[in-house]
Amino acid sequence: MRHTIIAAAAVAALAVAGQAGAHARLIVGSPKAGSTVAAPPQLKLQYSESIVPAASSVKVTGPGGAMVATGPLMLDAKNKRIVLIPITAKAAPGAYKVAWHMKTEDGHETDGGFAFTVK
């Protein structure tokens, strides 16, 4: 019985430690990864942690790898986990890639990306 309690406590401690050291991950994006959409006016990215916009960036490339003009990265007024990126030029039909680098309020930095298609 004593060994079971000690083992359970060790497992619980490891689980909590793993969560404390976790980096932000993208929960959902709009447009969604792999989706086909009409030209979006903005990207909306929701993360698992609060984001520091001044230390974060998003790059969007379109057909042929051309950079897509975007406005400044902003946080949603009600949720610091949601990042908004205006797309300032009309997106032409084709494949798009989004690459992001986010810094969270706890100081961790993480990178990721996804693709979508404009019809």
Positions of PLM-derived features:
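Bacterial N-terminal signal peptides that target proteins for export
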Residues: 1-7
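Short, exposed beta-strand-loop hairpins at the edges of beta-sheets
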Residues: 88, 92, 99-113
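Extended, polar beta-sheet/loop recognition surfaces of beta-rich domains
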Residues: 43-45, 108-119
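Bacterial N-terminal signal peptides
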Residues: 8-15
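Aromatic sugar-binding surface patches on proteins
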Residues: 78-84
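N-terminal signal peptide c-region/cleavage motif recognized by signal peptidases
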Residues: 17-19
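N-terminal edge beta-strand
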Residues: 21-39
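Short, surface-exposed alpha-helix to beta-strand junction/turn motifs within ectodomains of secreted
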Residues: 44-45, 49-71
